[in-house]
Amino acid sequence: RLFDAMSRERGFTFYLNVEVGQHLSHADLLEHHHAVLYAVGAPTDRRLAVEGAELPGVATATEVVAWYNGHPDYAGLSVRLDHERVVIIGNGNVALDVARILTADPDDLARTDIADHALAALRESKVREVVIAARRGPVHSAFTLPELIGLTAAADVVLDADDHALVLQDLQNADDPLSRSKLEILAKLGDA
């Protein structure tokens, strides 16, 4: 699995359950390393203030990611996979990653570090369509190129006809190479 391969890399050490401030200090880290990077992820969810956000079956993408990554606080999360269509609000990396997991072949996921309880639920999933809805258009989307490539390589992704027209329009005006690359991938997708 991913962490098994990484742990065999020369010069790589992975420590779990270490709390900076309790087990060691920031100064201790700097004493032994040239740089210290804190990669802790988003500290909290950002729930939308919309009607129905508190209903059963509604979860934040951060909660779903914690669920399929095996975080013990989210192992019992009720992730509703008993319907054919799921909607994800937002178009950042986490949204695309959740869409990729929900549409992935469970046999492919079995070769990853996905949590066993999530894999079992995904094997029984009735989800056949994932809709990503966002307030920003394609050129202002928050996802990165690798996340887009990961999703489009793993799933049959199509765009709403209006979004497809926006992509083509934005592509004509794109001067940023990264935005242009994202738009070129989106332009090749079929219409919904």
Feature map (PLM): residue ranges:
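N-terminal Rossmann-like dinucleotide/flavin-binding domain of flavoprotein oxidoreductases
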Residues: 1-35, 185-192
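Short hydrophobic core segments
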Residues: 31-41, 86-89
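Dinucleotide-binding/catalytic capping subdomain of oxidoreductase cores
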Residues: 100-192
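Flexible loop/turn segments at secondary-structure boundaries
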Residues: 22-24, 44-47, 67, 94-96, ...
